[in-house]
UniProtKB/Swiss-Prot annotation:
This is Chaperone protein ClpB. PANTHER family: ATP-DEPENDENT CLP PROTEASE (PTHR11638), HEAT SHOCK PROTEIN 104 (PTHR11638:SF18). It comes from Tropheryma whipplei (strain Twist). The lineage of its organism: Bacteria, Bacillati, Actinomycetota, Actinomycetes, Micrococcales. GO terms for biological process: cellular response to heat. One of its GO terms (cellular component) is cytoplasm. The keyword Repeat applies. The gene is clpB.
Length: 705
């Protein structure tokens, strides 16, 4: 009587504070576990020991530690375990449920003590996820932590416990208590390679198809693994690949459940025409009557198209729902067949395997054949869907090149030349690097391009970087002004202050910017003004495309273009007595004296910008006037400049040493200041034109309607 009563109470206590994984596995509610044979075998070996039979799974978050325990539960159900583990049960203990409501001193300890006694009697294997929480669970003032209560049982082998934790948590909590640590046997769980991860994804495919009621192509599985491995940093396989697949399937299911874009647009058009028809019916003039007849005819045609499209969509959606229901039925039938085989109900298993499932598969094949040649919505997850999710997560455009994107890349030099004048060599180098990256030919372990731009001030070095960011990177530019890093101690601002220093909690300016925007242009402006040791930090970035910040996080630079600008040797380029080849040699010599060889050797290209000529300045005048017109576009005011004034501006604003910046100041003083006075005095109004001309050596403004 006592034994029967105790087991009943024990079962209720275990149910209260835990989840029976073997029972869940017996009903096929756990996802299939593919691979991890070595880790599961090692766990079985440790559990079969006489003492210290407590494995602890240690690995990064997302590598599949919990899945290994679920795989062991499935093997116990299937009988594929050593004799010592046959008919055992694995119970996942919920420490939060054990702690909840234990408000009085000693209540938590009593719960733990009763639970441990019941576990010893029932001979179950306990699994605790985040096992490091044992160290602090219940450790209030005057109380005993759960970890200390477990130590004697763990040492004697009277309690079998499987733990799971991360490397950092293990080091921080368990290693600090050697008495508890030595009672566990470590099982390291590493990240699976790409081939193993693809096998895992294929094993999960049917479950996700049944849940989302869509089909998943094999290429989508492979794409999910490859893209997550390359573009999603800070997380581990297979977790991040599974998340990609899950979200892509969820997005597709949402599209199926809502109206297609074509149908939605047509419905809105019909609603607009109906409103216009109602408004015109109250008018009696001939024009309105004629317009009403036209609207009525349009509405009739659009309504007929809408009805046809709606009927087609209803039919297609019904077919998709039937396909989803059939897949779900097949999945349930397969699970039922597995359960029947394990329980020895061979007649039921035979009926399911050789009658029910083949019939369902036949019905599914028939429904799939009914698919329209041009469906409104696809029910299959394709690589493009996976790429869309990656783009949404990271901002990196990993979709296959669209026609317009390819056209833009082919004409990138022309587009950049509209913003940067007379620097064809530099523009060509940058454009080639971008095309290599977008075509997938660049080294996947290095940044898309690393350049050092040299030349006099005001020739367009920074402007070229801004133009590239505006065209291809949606304006995403990470700008680091190196003049702010002239002191040695300021280096820590790039990656964050080290532990123990003020500002350690704050992120580094460089690492945090790239971590948040991994697809961007990184500009190190005025590089020669920084402390020499700053460039030691950049060596790893230029060579391996990664950098570790002060918090130990690895930041990925592989999708960035890195540009450093400098004025080193600009005096040689501005010296008109030197030939271009000689000037370039002098500049390169000075660069080699300023920067270390290991730094220069990691750059893709050192680009020298040429000084601007008088004709180049004329084109820059046009660019500045165009920029001014864009700024006042909202007022509908237009600024025009006569040819005489244009030539005068280019001549007066030209300086071979200072480049185009004196011209900008001249235009600001002679044109923008005069225009500002006209606007404030009310002499020019919206929609008018301000014409600027040169008369008697002075600039005059005239307002035209």
């Amino acid at each position: 009587m006592c034994g029967g009563s105790f087991m009943s109470e024990s079962q209720s206590e275990l149910d209260k504070y835990g989840t029976n994984l073997t029972k869940t596995a017996a009903t096929n509610k756990l996802d299939p576990v593919i691979g991890r044979d070595a880790e599961i075998r090692r766990v079985c070996q440790i559990l079969s020991r006489r003492t210290k039979n407590n494995p602890v799974l240690i690995g990064s978050a997302g590598v599949g530690k919990t899945a290994i325990v679920e795989g062991l539960a499935q093997r116990i159900v299937a009988g594929d375990v050593p004799e010592s583990l046959r008919n055992k049960e694995i119970v996942s203990l919920d420490l939060s449920a054990l702690l909840a409501g234990a408000s009085y001193r000693g209540e938590f300890e009593k719960r733990v003590k009763n639970l441990l006694e019941e576990i010893q009697k029932s001979k179950v294997i306990i699994f605790i996820d985040e096992v490091h929480t044992l160290m602090s669970a219940g450790a209030a003032e005057g109380a005993i932590a759960a970890g200390n209560m477990l130590k004697p049982l763990l040492a004697r082998g009277e309690l079998r416990l499987i733990g799971a934790t991360t490397l950092d948590e293990y080091r921080e909590h368990l290693e600090k208590d050697p008495a508890l640590e030595r009672r566990f046997q470590q099982v390291f769980v590493g990240e699976p390679n790409l081939e193993d991860c693809i096998a895992i994804m294929r094993g999960l495919k049917e479950r996700y198809e049944a849940h989302h009621k869509v089909s998943i192509s094999d290429t989508a599985l492979v794409t999910a693994v490859e893209l997550s491995s390359r573009y999603i940093t800070g997380r581990q396989l297979p977790d991040k690949a599974i998340d990609l697949l899950d979200e892509a399937a969820s997005s597709l299911r949402m599209e199926i459940d809502s109206s297609p874009v074509e149908l939605d647009q047509l419905r809105r058009e019909v609603d607009r025409l109906r409103l216009e028809e109602l408004a015109l019916k109250s008018e009696n003039d001939p024009t309105s009557e004629q317009r009403l007849r036209s609207i009525t005819n349009q509405l009739s045609g659009k309504q007929e198209m809408l009805n046809t499209l709606q009927a087609s969509w209803n039919s297609e959606r019904a077919r998709l729902n039937q396909i989803g229901a059939l897949k779900e039925q097949i999945d349930i039938a397969k699970q039922s067949a597995d359960i029947a085989q394990r329980e020895g109900r061979l007649e039921d298993a035979s009926r399911l395997l050789y009658a029910t499932i083949p019939q369902l598969q036949k019905n599914l094949a028939e429904k799939l054949e009914e698919q329209d040649s041009a469906p409104l919505v696809s029910d299959q997850v394709m690589p493009e869907d996976i790429a869309s999710v990656v783009e949404g997560w990271t901002g990196i455009p990993v979709k296959k090149l669209m026609q317009k994107d390819a056209k833009q890349l082919l004409h990138l030099e022309e587009d950049l030349s509209k913003s940067v004048i007379a620097q064809k060599v530099a523009i060509g180098v940058i454009a080639d690097a971008v095309r290599r990256s977008r075509a997938g030919l660049s080294d996947p372990n290095r940044p898309s391009g690393t350049f050092l731009f040299l030349g006099p001030t005001g020739v367009g070095k920074t402007q070229l970087v801004k133009a590239l960011a505006s065209l291809l990177y949606d304006g995403e530019i990470v700008r680091i002004d190196m003049s702010e890093y002239s002191e040695k101690f300021s280096i820590s601002r790039l990656i964050g202050a080290p532990p123990g220093y003020i500002g350690h909690e704050s992120a580094g300016q460089l690492t945090e910017s790239v971590r948040r925007r991994p697809y961007s242009v990184v500009l190190f402006d005025e590089a020669e003004k920084a402390h020499p040791e700053v460039f030691d930090i950049l060596l790893q970035v230029l060579d391996e495309g990664r950098l570790t910040d002060s918090h130990g996080r690895t930041v990925d630079f592989r999708n960035t273009i890195i540009v450093l600008t400098s004025n080193i040797g600009s005096r040689y380029l501005s010296d008109i007595s030197l030939e271009a080849t000689t000037a370039h040699e002098y500049v390169n010599d000075e660069v080699r004296r300023t920067f270390r060889p290991e730094f220069l050797n990691r750059l893709d290209e050192i680009v020298i910008f040429e000084p601007l000529s008088q004709s180049d300045i004329c084109q820059i005048v046009d660019l500045n006037i165009e920029s001014l017109n864009k700024r006042i576009k909202d007022r509908r005011i237009v600024v025009t400049v006569s040819e005489d004034l244009r030539r005068w501006l280019s001549k007066s604003g030209y300086d071979v040493i200072y480049g185009a910046r004196p011209l900008r100041r001249l235009i600001q003083r002679e044109i923008e200041d005069r225009l500002a006075k006209l606007i404030i005095e009310g002499l020019i109004h919206d929609g008018q034109t301000a014409s600027f001309d040169l008369s008697g050596g002075a600039v005059n403004a005239q307002v035209c309607s």
